[in-house]
């Protein structure tokens, strides 16, 4: 129906007759000449109709925004006075000789431009219209380029694209499963995969030593700006490669994406132990563009006559830390109060601070309500340790280690954003040497990543002291966002059983849930490992979108619903009967009396 896209017509097409198909972006009538800006996925071109062709001119006079047209005409150069430097096609126009209205359109519920501020609920309800906007078109085109580049890179590195099942069984991976009732097996359910984890490990046992898949995954969890109930994962697994080799291959992939699609050289991906990331930056995914660090001062505060500091300093599970903000002395008190409220989200009971007006005057040069509680020798040691200068601001955290780490880690990111402290545009790194387990409130252990991650110790050492064991896991972080995570997997049956035992999974439960995996590990499972990248999150970062909902064609809302199709929806009684499901009426809970 067409010979060329609207957005690619240029001066090389001058004097050629072309046929275009697209949507009316704008229509203007200027002194008897009708101008139509015709839009398709590649951009916009101006089409001109004049009264000399009366029938086509009359038809052009009827078109309105978002009508679908087929236009034939001759490309001609614009006059110097009418060249539009803001359009890619602004040096030419198409003189229309034929016009066909393929479909009319009602007035859209919102303007399809980049300047109209439309609520996200409206955009999602009319997503098929929202996707016509240039920003959305560009993001989805970019996404297609990324997936194509990923496939090419992995194909060139001898990886095989192998699909794994969508209907599988529930396995403990940290979030709730989406369950699918079985019609043919009464009372039993499939689960939609949270990841292809076990199947890709089984592919390694099968001898497919380099696997990848751009896989749909599903998690029934609370949603945030970077979460969706269904999401896309770049899933990778290899045999006979250690951590450094896996990190090298995947680092090369991400570097190539940025180089070829963004024109950005990411440079070196430094390695940082998990313990250092948490101690200095308060996060296992630190944003290394921000030049702020948390400094331990527990030893300085253990004996001061200020319980807010000395209490946590004397507590083995407490932490007292300080963070210097260069030039932060100019932050007004009102903003400090706002930061105090901000850290309370993470359990902090307050936010102590010192403004350094004159570091040589410990009595009059330090501005803070807490200075009077701290001896001068402690203040001097504090200033020396932090290497402060006049005009700096020091924030303090004193509480349980968990609260201090999370609160000041979040404050560090907030300060970086508010004060524009970023020292570079992109800061990648690998976080390594993660703990194997983390302790829950009841004292039990849970896997920090998942129970198939290999520890960096023997089964005997793991059994003797599981709480201190490190894993062979690694996360790729970019600008404070976890792009992907992975690990070397357990390929020895006895080690896998020991990890299950540490996690409180008895032999009977092991056989019930993971019998197929334990059996596979008996038949010559090779050393293997891999990782997975969140494709949606990667595209969000690369395009600068504020949410992954802006890089997915048809996303769900933050309540895991589709307002366009009204999903999830009710099903008829017959379908429920076939699935052996009976719905109980929802009983309203009585309100508590105040």
UniProtKB/Swiss-Prot annotation:
<dbReference type="GO" id="GO:0005524">
    <property type="term" value="F:ATP binding"/>
</dbReference>
<feature type="binding site">
    <location>
        <position position="173"/>
    </location>
    <ligand>
        <name>L-aspartate</name>
    </ligand>
</feature>
<dbReference type="InterPro" id="IPR047089">
    <property type="entry name" value="Asp-tRNA-ligase_1_N"/>
</dbReference>
<dbReference type="Pfam" id="PF02938">
    <property type="entry name" value="GAD"/>
</dbReference>
<feature type="binding site">
    <location>
        <position position="228"/>
    </location>
    <ligand>
        <name>ATP</name>
    </ligand>
</feature>
<dbReference type="InterPro" id="IPR047090">
    <property type="entry name" value="AspRS_core"/>
</dbReference>
<dbReference type="Pfam" id="PF01336">
    <property type="entry name" value="tRNA_anti-codon"/>
</dbReference>
<dbReference type="GO" id="GO:0005737">
    <property type="term" value="C:cytoplasm"/>
</dbReference>
<keyword id="KW-0030">Aminoacyl-tRNA synthetase</keyword>
<comment type="subunit">
    <text>Homodimer.</text>
</comment>
<dbReference type="InterPro" id="IPR045864">
    <property type="entry name" value="aa-tRNA-synth_II/BPL/LPL"/>
</dbReference>
<protein>
    <recommendedName>
        <fullName>Aspartate--tRNA(Asp/Asn) ligase</fullName>
        <ecNumber>6.1.1.23</ecNumber>
    </recommendedName>
</protein>
<dbReference type="InterPro" id="IPR004364">
    <property type="entry name" value="Aa-tRNA-synt_II"/>
</dbReference>
<keyword id="KW-0067">ATP-binding</keyword>
<comment type="function">
    <text>Aspartyl-tRNA synthetase with relaxed tRNA specificity since it is able to aspartylate not only its cognate tRNA(Asp) but also tRNA(Asn). Reaction proceeds in two steps: L-aspartate is first activated by ATP to form Asp-AMP and then transferred to the acceptor end of tRNA(Asp/Asn).</text>
</comment>
<dbReference type="GO" id="GO:0006422">
    <property type="term" value="P:aspartyl-tRNA aminoacylation"/>
</dbReference>
<dbReference type="InterPro" id="IPR004524">
    <property type="entry name" value="Asp-tRNA-ligase_1"/>
</dbReference>
<dbReference type="Pfam" id="PF00152">
    <property type="entry name" value="tRNA-synt_2"/>
</dbReference>
<feature type="binding site">
    <location>
        <begin position="219"/>
        <end position="221"/>
    </location>
    <ligand>
        <name>ATP</name>
    </ligand>
</feature>
<keyword id="KW-0436">Ligase</keyword>
<feature type="binding site">
    <location>
        <position position="449"/>
    </location>
    <ligand>
        <name>L-aspartate</name>
    </ligand>
</feature>
<feature type="binding site">
    <location>
        <position position="489"/>
    </location>
    <ligand>
        <name>L-aspartate</name>
    </ligand>
</feature>
<feature type="region of interest" description="Aspartate">
    <location>
        <begin position="197"/>
        <end position="200"/>
    </location>
</feature>
<dbReference type="InterPro" id="IPR004115">
    <property type="entry name" value="GAD-like_sf"/>
</dbReference>
<dbReference type="GO" id="GO:0004815">
    <property type="term" value="F:aspartate-tRNA ligase activity"/>
</dbReference>
<keyword id="KW-0648">Protein biosynthesis</keyword>
<feature type="site" description="Important for tRNA non-discrimination">
    <location>
        <position position="30"/>
    </location>
</feature>
<dbReference type="GO" id="GO:0050560">
    <property type="term" value="F:aspartate-tRNA(Asn) ligase activity"/>
</dbReference>
<dbReference type="InterPro" id="IPR004365">
    <property type="entry name" value="NA-bd_OB_tRNA"/>
</dbReference>
<dbReference type="InterPro" id="IPR029351">
    <property type="entry name" value="GAD_dom"/>
</dbReference>
<comment type="similarity">
    <text>Belongs to the class-II aminoacyl-tRNA synthetase family. Type 1 subfamily.</text>
</comment>
<dbReference type="InterPro" id="IPR012340">
    <property type="entry name" value="NA-bd_OB-fold"/>
</dbReference>
<feature type="binding site">
    <location>
        <begin position="534"/>
        <end position="537"/>
    </location>
    <ligand>
        <name>ATP</name>
    </ligand>
</feature>
<keyword id="KW-0547">Nucleotide-binding</keyword>
<dbReference type="InterPro" id="IPR006195">
    <property type="entry name" value="aa-tRNA-synth_II"/>
</dbReference>
<feature type="binding site">
    <location>
        <position position="219"/>
    </location>
    <ligand>
        <name>L-aspartate</name>
    </ligand>
</feature>
<dbReference type="GO" id="GO:0003676">
    <property type="term" value="F:nucleic acid binding"/>
</dbReference>
<keyword id="KW-0963">Cytoplasm</keyword>
<dbReference type="InterPro" id="IPR002312">
    <property type="entry name" value="Asp/Asn-tRNA-synth_IIb"/>
</dbReference>
<feature type="binding site">
    <location>
        <position position="482"/>
    </location>
    <ligand>
        <name>ATP</name>
    </ligand>
</feature>
């Amino acid at each position: 129906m067409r010979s060329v896209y609207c957005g690619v017509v240029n001066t090389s097409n001058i004097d050629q007759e072309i046929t275009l198909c697209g949507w009316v972006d704008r229509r203007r009538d200027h002194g008897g000449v009708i101008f139509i800006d015709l839009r398709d996925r590649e951009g916009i071109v101006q089409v001109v109709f004049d009264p000399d062709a009366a029938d086509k001119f009359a038809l052009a006079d009827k078109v309105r925004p978002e009508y679908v047209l087929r236009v034939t005409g001759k490309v001609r150069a614009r006059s110097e006075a009418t060249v539009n430097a803001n359009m890619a096609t602004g040096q030419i126009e198409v003189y229309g000789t034929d016009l066909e209205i393929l479909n009319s359109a009602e007035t859209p519920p919102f303007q399809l431009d980049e300047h109209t501020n439309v609520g996200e609920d409206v955009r999602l309800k009319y997503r098929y219209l929202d996707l016509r906007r240039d920003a959305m078109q560009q993001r989805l085109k970019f996404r297609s380029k990324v997936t194509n580049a990923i496939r090419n890179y992995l194909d060139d590195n001898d990886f095989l694209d192998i699909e794994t099942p969508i209907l599988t069984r529930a396995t403990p991976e940290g979030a709730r499963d989406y369950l699918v009732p079985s019609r043919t097996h009464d009372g039993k359910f499939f689960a939609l995969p949270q990841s292809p984890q076990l199947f890709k490990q089984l592919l390694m046992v099968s001898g497919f030593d380099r696997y990848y898949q751009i896989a749909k995954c599903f998690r029934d969890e609370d949603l945030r700006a970077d979460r969706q109930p269904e999401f896309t994962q770049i899933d990778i697994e290899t045999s006979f490669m250690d951590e450094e080799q896996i990190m090298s291959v995947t680092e090369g992939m991400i570097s190539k994406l940025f180089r070829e699609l963004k024109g950005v050289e990411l440079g070196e991906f430094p390695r940082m132990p998990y313990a250092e990331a948490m101690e200095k930056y308060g996060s296992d995914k630190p944003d290394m563009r921000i030049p702020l660090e948390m400094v331990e001062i527990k030893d300085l505060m253990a004996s001061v006559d200020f319980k807010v500091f000395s209490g946590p300093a004397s507590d083995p599970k407490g932490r007292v830390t300080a963070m210097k903000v260069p030039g932060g002395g100019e932050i007004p008190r009102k903003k400090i109060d706002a930061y105090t409220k901000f850290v309370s989200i993470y359990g902090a009971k307050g936010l102590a601070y010192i403004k350094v007006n004159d570091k040589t005057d410990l009595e009059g040069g330090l501005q803070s309500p807490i200075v009077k509680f701290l001896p001068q020798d402690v203040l001097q040691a504090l200033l020396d340790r932090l290497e402060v200068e006049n005009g700096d601001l020091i924030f303090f955290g004193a509480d349980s280690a968990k609260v201090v780490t999370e609160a000041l880690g979040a404050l560090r990111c907030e300060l970086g954003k508010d004060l524009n402290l970023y020292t570079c545009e992109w800061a990648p790194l690998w976080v390594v040497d993660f703990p194997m387990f983390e302790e829950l409130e009841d004292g039990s252990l849970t896997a920090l990543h998942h129970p198939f991650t290999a520890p960096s110790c023997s089964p005997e050492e793991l059994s003797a002291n599981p709480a201190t064991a490190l894993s062979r896991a690694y996360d790729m972080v970019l600008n404070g966002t976890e792009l992907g995570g992975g690990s070397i997997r357990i390929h020895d049956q006895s080690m896998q059983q020991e990890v299950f035992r540490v996690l409180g999974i008895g032999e009977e439960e092991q056989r019930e849930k993971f019998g197929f995996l334990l059996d596979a590990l008996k038949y010559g499972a090779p050393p293997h490992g891999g990782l997975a990248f969140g494709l949606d999150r990667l595209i969000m970062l690369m395009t600068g979108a504020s949410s992954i909902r802006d890089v997915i064609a048809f996303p769900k809302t933050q309540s895991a619903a589709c307002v366009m199709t009204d999903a999830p929806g009710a099903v008829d009684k017959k379908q429920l009967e076939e699935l052996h499901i009976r719905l109980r009426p929802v009983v309203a809970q009585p309100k508590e009396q105040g």
